[in-house]
């Protein structure tokens, strides 16, 4: 059995394996939502050969064919988990481990597990994932002979605003910079304490906006050969694809080589892009994580990254998509996209944190450092999912059997029995389960309803999406919150559409081509930044190193940012005293920042938190006393977690008690150790 994280990856491997196994008379099967019922039934009737499947489809097998599982997998010898790094420390990973461990108990045999990944650094976590009982028995096989060279360039651009280049958007603000040259001029003026002249000028609608400038650069750099251009949001990908389509039309290009590939586009659109790349067509594709995995798209000359990703691992994974041919270098062009200076700019924004993070990620990548996997979360929501799954599969069982199956011999061995009992009581009080006079636990009507829903197979939270169609053409899907009213416009697949009709029952939006546009909001959350990345950002800001991979504008911008930080003594002073408030740069990761905010809130101190700074609404004396208490570890992390506003993060969290939510959030969102280290650093006790 081959387990892959994406249907597209499974389809790709299926095509390769089917040809490979044809002459050996080894049947190859695939099982996911797009595979016909006939093909699935053929596998269930005569199991054997190779099965390619996603965790969610394996879940559906347990749910819908529970009594046939022993027969289907009776001779399972090997399990290959592709892109192993994408599962470890993640909801889907815990879900997959639970299913595999349940499977071994049902078929009473232990198949050999193998994990494949190009970006693994935390081998201890990888070993535990494959064999919790005896992780020392897991063998690590590394390619230590690889000497592939890499070429990196970092460029700086003002961040395009959502309305950039949109004639329907009114420009009623000050005239702000649209190039790095103008950003530097403004930054130098601000450093002297003055206000840039352009802010005083009347608003100007400038055709050379930040979006157009960036698009023209991309058109110059990526107009030949095959390239992948990764963005951190589908919104930016759509904006740039549309801008380039307008440029191509206006300038009468013979062809527009810029296409899109992301999860909101239809399968047909994505597969067409993959096919054209694979046959060697010179295309540059704006994409998100959908092409980060190992789908076969042929040779890619270079990789673009618009805005730094959240992790070094993601940067390495994306860079690895290029330079796969013998003798070729892997090429990365990283664009930092910071907000241009304006009258509303914060001090943090003037430090260009995107540029600092871009450099920090490259430096850590060159040092061969990758983030360790986060295995602190107890994954209570996924445990609830698996309890419901077992009850649906079996029809009911005793609490002791559930405990043995999922905790003692399953994927939730770290969960205390007391917490497990609290979870069962919570499911009972919420009427998802009920207990028979015999002691057996079964699904209550609400539990039956939940496990029969289409989205139950996934342990992670989904969103309601509408299909976007032009006649019979399926363009893609958009979240419900992104659908504009009838008569208004949207962007999808780099094209402009007008909404003609919305069918809320069928979840379908009918559109026609149009000239107006409105960039869709796809949702999503900010990623988690590791403490070492934040610390490296500080080193970049305070150091004097010259980074040879910085393009001229990026190097000059770093000089300007360093001069501004030096003038304000940002890295010398513990905080910037503003009378009734203090601005602090903790240089810690996301968990440390959240914990510092929670500590302040617990003592009644109001704070405003940005990505790398916190403004404390108090005077210097109070903040010194407060941070001293933080540094001395006088806070209880579960008490801090009780103050978190949005406690429910995962799919079934709403069925957990506050006590369990606080326990979970104290580990998955907060880190008292990081906060203590940061407070000591702020107070000069590093």
PLM regions and their residue ranges:
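Short, charged/polar, Gly/Pro-enriched secondary-structure boundary elements
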Residues: 159-162, 447-454, 517-520, 621-627
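Terminal, basic amphipathic appendages of nucleotide-handling enzymes
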Residues: 194, 328, 463, 503-576, ...
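Short beta-strands and strand-coil junctions in structured, solvent-facing domains, enriched
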Residues: 293, 411-412, 497-498, 507-508, ...
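Long C-terminal interaction/binding lobes of large macromolecular proteins
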Residues: 312-314, 322-353, 360, 369, ...
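C-terminal accessory/connector segments of nucleic-acid motor ATPases
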Residues: 369-496, 501-502, 578-587, 591, ...
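C-terminal helical accessory/scaffold domains
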Residues: 554, 559-564, 570-603
């Amino acid at each position: 059995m081959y387990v892959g994280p994406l249907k597209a990856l499974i389809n790709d491997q299926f095509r390769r394996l089917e040809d490979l196994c044809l002459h050996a008379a080894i049947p190859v099967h695939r099982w996911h939502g797009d595979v016909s019922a006939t093909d699935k039934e053929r596998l269930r009737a005569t199991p054997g050969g190779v099965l390619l499947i996603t965790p969610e489809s394996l879940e559906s097998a347990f749910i819908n064919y529970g009594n046939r599982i022993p027969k289907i997998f009776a001779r399972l010898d090997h399990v290959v988990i592709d892109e192993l790094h994408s599962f470890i420390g993640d909801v889907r990973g815990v879900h997959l481990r639970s299913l595999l461990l349940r499977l071994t108990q049902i078929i009473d045999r232990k198949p050999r597990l193998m994990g494949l990944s190009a970006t693994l650094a935390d081998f201890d976590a990888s070993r535990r994932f494959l064999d919790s009982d005896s992780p020392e028995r897991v063998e690590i096989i590394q390619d230590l002979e690889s000497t592939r060279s890499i070429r990196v360039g970092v460029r700086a651009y003002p961040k395009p605003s959502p309305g950039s280049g949109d004639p329907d958007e009114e420009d009623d603000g000050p005239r702000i910079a649209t190039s790095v040259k103008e950003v530097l001029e403004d930054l130098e003026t601000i450093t002297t304490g003055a206000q840039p002249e352009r802010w005083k000028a009347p608003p100007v609608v400038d055709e050379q906006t930040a979006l157009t400038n960036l698009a023209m650069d991309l058109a110059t750099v990526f107009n030949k050969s095959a390239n992948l251009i990764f963005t951190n949001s589908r919104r930016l990908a759509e904006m740039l694809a549309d801008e380039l389509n307008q440029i191509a039309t206006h300038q009468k290009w013979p062809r527009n080589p810029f296409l899109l590939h992301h999860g909101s586009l239809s399968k047909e659109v994505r597969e067409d892009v993959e096919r054209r790349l694979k046959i060697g067509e010179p295309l540059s594709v704006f994409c998100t994580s959908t092409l980060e995995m190992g789908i076969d798209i042929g040779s890619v000359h270079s990789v673009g990254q618009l805005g730094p990703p959240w992790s070094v691992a993601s940067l390495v994974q994306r860079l690895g998509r290029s330079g796969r041919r013998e003798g070729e270098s892997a090429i990365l062009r990283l664009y930092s996209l910071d907000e241009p200076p304006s009258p509303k700019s914060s001090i943090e924004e003037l430090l260009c944190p995107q540029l600092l993070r871009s450099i920090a990620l490259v430096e850590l990548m060159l040092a061969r450092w990758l983030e360790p996997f986060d295995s602190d979360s107890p994954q209570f929501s996924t445990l609830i999912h698996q309890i419901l799954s077992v009850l649906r599969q079996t029809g009911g069982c005793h609490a002791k059997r559930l405990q043995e199956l999922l905790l003692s011999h399953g994927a939730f061995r770290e969960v205390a029995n007391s917490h497990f009992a609290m979870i069962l009581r919570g499911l009972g009080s919420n009427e998802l389960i009920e207990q028979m006079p015999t002691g057996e636990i079964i699904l209550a009507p609400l539990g039956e309803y939940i496990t029969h829903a289409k989205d139950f197979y996934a342990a992670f939270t989904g969103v309601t999406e509408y299909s976007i169609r032009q006649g019979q053409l399926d363009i893609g899907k958009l979240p419900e919150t992104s659908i504009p009213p009838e008569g208004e416009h949207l962007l999808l697949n780099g094209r402009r559409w007008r909404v003609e009709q919305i069918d809320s029952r069928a979840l379908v939006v009918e559109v026609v081509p149009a000239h107006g546009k409105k960039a869709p909001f796809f949702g999503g959350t900010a990623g988690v930044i590791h403490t070492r990345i934040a610390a490296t950002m500080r080193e970049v800001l305070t150091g004097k190193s010259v980074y040879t991979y910085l393009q001229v504008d990026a190097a000059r911008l770093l000089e300007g940012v360093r001069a501004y930080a030096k003038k304000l003594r940002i890295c010398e002073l513990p905080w910037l005293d503003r009378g009734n408030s203090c601005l602090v740069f903790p240089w810690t990761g996301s968990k440390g920042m959240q914990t510092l905010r929670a500590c302040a809130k617990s003592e009644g101190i109001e704070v405003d938190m940005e990505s790398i700074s916190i403004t404390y609404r108090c005077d210097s004396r109070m903040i010194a006393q407060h941070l001293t208490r933080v540094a001395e570890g006088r806070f209880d992390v579960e008490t801090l977690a009780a103050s978190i506003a949005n406690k429910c993060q995962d799919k079934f969290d709403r069925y957990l008690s506050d006590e369990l939510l606080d326990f979970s959030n104290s580990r998955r969102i907060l880190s008292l150790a990081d906060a203590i280290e940061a407070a000591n650093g702020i107070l000069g006790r590093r």
